[in-house]
Structure formats: structure tokens, C-alpha cells
Amino acid sequence: MIYNFSVENKIRLDEFLRENLPNCVKNQEISNSKIRRLIIAGSVFVNNSQIRRPAYIVFPKSKISVNFDENKFFYEKQPDDIKYEVTQKDVLFEDEYLIVINKPSLFPTEETIVGGQKRDNLHQAVIRWIWKNNPSLRNPPYVGIMHRLDRETSGAILFTKQRCVNNDIHKMFEEHSVKKIYHAIAVTNQKNQIKDSFFIENYMGRISPKSSAAKWGFVPEKNGGLYSKTEFKILNKSNYKNMDLFYIEAQLKTGRTHQIRVHLSSAGLPLLGDELYGGIPEKRIMLHSKCLEFVHPITKEQLKINAPIPDFFNKYYNL
């Protein structure tokens, strides 16, 4: 089904679709993450040009078309998410403006609708946590989503508690001034020497059909690919049940969907548990957001926030 729109006011593309697309779909809600996925997947065209940037600005008289299959869009199989509530030990940093949580694996960052039902998510869990600790509030507290972690990725993730810091934090992420360090366990059967440090840079986009599981890969810039770069460092090597394992530190220089997963797979080092990109099956994808480092937008303090390595990683390494 193709839906066509005409723009009346200057606005971000994702915000325009959030306001207008639900009116075309009867009895269905469309979450922010669904809107973002539609755009990144290449389903949205502005003036006949494919646009993959949710923050893209559209202007009056622009023509927008959206092409998607409603049945596949709304009625996906419900994943087996864990049940989770934030506890004090999960709070890595908190003040009146910001909160950083140690996200568990197998729990989505934000709301999605699967099989016609809303899934619980970390964003709502943080709202519940703040409200629980501020029972005098008459309405749910504000919590802003600044970035996202994949459902199976654990570790440090930042939310805002006041709208006044949103622009500064958004700008930090857009300008890549937030230092993001991940730890990962990758597996390989390559006989070639793996360098102790290396980087990968290329252009990325969705390579799977819209009717199948979302998969990203290398896409030329002229075809809508977005620049991506990751720096890698090998921290340790071992052998586990005849598998060559590498304990890796990854520093994101950009923040594309599945970026670390795609880059390591392209280097012959798919993440353990990441079957989508060639990894060996495991209970979870072995990727953890280890550290966020940034300047506090109000106090100007340099913050370095570390998330403890999950116990499950110790199955392979004594970390």
C-alpha cells in the first residue's frame, strides 16, 4: 500500500509521519520506533527521492510517499522478552537532568507494537522507576530517549529527565562527541592473522527486502548508504569448544543500525550469538555497551560512565 502526503509546514520527516501516518491506518497505533524503521528501511520518498534519515527536514509543498505492507508491518511474531523493572543497582548515573541505566539483554529500548500488542520496554521501565521514587508527581515523569541499543545488546544507555537538555544531548550524538565503547565476543574460523587493532569504514543501509527480517550491510552512498566507521581493539583471545574467540573493544565513530555487528561480520569476526550476521547460536548476542563518556550539558563536568560486564560473558572469559 502506498500513502501520499503533502507538507504544509517545515518539520522533521519522522515527526511528520508520526502526526499523519496513523490517520491512514484504522485501529492501529504506530510507535516512534516503527516510524524510524520505515524510514531507515527505505520505505519513504520525498519528492521522488528515497530518504533514510529520520531527522531529514521537509519543507512546505514537499511530496511524501510511504510504501509498506500493513500485515507484515503490524503482525510480526512476538519475541520472548524478559520481564524487567529498574533497580538501584541498574542506575549507573542520575541527577535532576540525566539518568544512565545498565540495560539488560533481551529487552527493547523503546515501545514497539507486535501482533497488535504493545511490548514493555526500557523507556517505560525508567518512567516507572522515576515515578516510584517521586510518588508526589501527579503525572508520569518525562523521560527522553537520546539513543538506542538493540534488544539483545546490554549496557549503558542515556535518557534525559528534562526537556531543557535535549537539544544539547542530541547535538552531542549527532556530532559524535559522545564517546561510546562496546565490549564484544566474536568467533572466527579464519586462519589469517587478526590484527590487534583495526578500523572499518564504509557506507551502510538496509539490504534485506522489507518483507523479511531487517538486515543491514554495505550500500553505496549514491544508493542511500550512510557513512559509518568503527575502531576495534583485540583485548584477549582464547579457544572454547574448538572455537577461536576474540574479546574485542569497539569504539563507534558513527551510530548506524547494527553497525558493530555488520562491521565485525565483514571482517570475518561475527559476534557470538548473532546468527543474522553469521555468528554461532547462543542465548544472546555477545555485545555490551561498556562505557559512555561525554560532557554534562549543565554542569560541564566530563562524565565517564561504565557498565559492569554481564555475568553471562564469564562463560567464555573470566572478566
Model-derived features: positions:
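RNA pseudouridine synthases
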Residues: 1-319
